[in-house]
Amino acid sequence: MTQPVAKRFPTPSIDRLPDDIRTRLLAVQEKSGFVPNVFLTLAYRPDEFRAFFAYHDALMDKDGGLTKAEREMIVVATSSANQCHYCVIAHGAILRIRAKNPQIADQIAVNYRKADITPRQRAMLDFAMKVSIEANKISEQDFTDLASHGFSDDDVWDIAAISAFFALSNRMANVTAMRPNDEFYMMGRLPK
């Protein structure tokens, strides 16, 4: 039995979407072989889709002091804390691929403090979790600790922005009952 993309809101047909959104979905499908359900779910509200993915791309696709794998570590750790099934599975797949490590996503999702990561990455995730769960407790000491691990002000901003953005994503995925695509489960687990 085929599961719905998201249970609580209608999923628009790709051929009925605005041209720019349809073009993006088809490009993603061509590159990955499938359309991730987040695209189909959020296409229900085209203006919000555009804003969401513009900010996503600005945070996740740029060069900077954080590697793309480290950005995905933030997503997986905070999404796990927020109990977001979709984001843990989907971004876990991306993390496995970007880190070239089939075990890292599971380790981070279960308990990043015991994962095979560097002290710098642990400090990054400690701060990301604080932003995600108890941002009201952020203090100057957090910035001092991050600086001692070599993070610049822009890096700290990126850690915070990724954590905050995916808090929105986690909540929308849970509200819509978004289902991870089956393809995500095995991605990055086996050598090509």
Predicted regions and their residues:
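Hydrophobic alpha-helical segments
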Residues: 1-192
